[in-house]
Amino acid sequence: MAQLKVQQKKGVVGIKANQRETLRTLGLKRIGDVVVKEDRPEIRGMVNTVRHLVTVEEVE
C-alpha cells in the first residue's frame, strides 16, 4: 500500500483551532516535522484540511 510523507511547512500561530488539532492528530508539532502515514481516505481528508500548511509526497 502507498504511503504519504507529510511535512509541516508553516507554523500554527493565527490558524483556526480545528486546523491546529488536525496537525496534532497527524503527529506534526513544529515547522519541519515529517511523518509517514498510510494513504487512506481519512488521512487524505486531514491533509486536505491543512493543505496550506503542509507539503505531501507519495512514497512506496
Swiss-Prot record:
Cite the CDD domains for this sequence.
Answer: Ribosomal_L30
PANTHER family with a match to the protein in the record: LARGE RIBOSOMAL SUBUNIT PROTEIN UL30M, MITOCHONDRIAL RIBOSOMAL PROTEIN L30
Keyword presence, DNA-binding: no
- Protein name per UniProt: Large ribosomal subunit protein uL30
GO cellular component labels:
cytosolic large ribosomal subunit
Instruction: List the HAMAP family hit by this protein, alphabetically.
Output: Ribosomal_uL30_B
**Gene behind the chain:** rpmD
Q: Does the keyword Ribosomal protein apply?
A: yes
The UniProt entry's sequence similarity note says: Belongs to the universal ribosomal protein uL30 family.
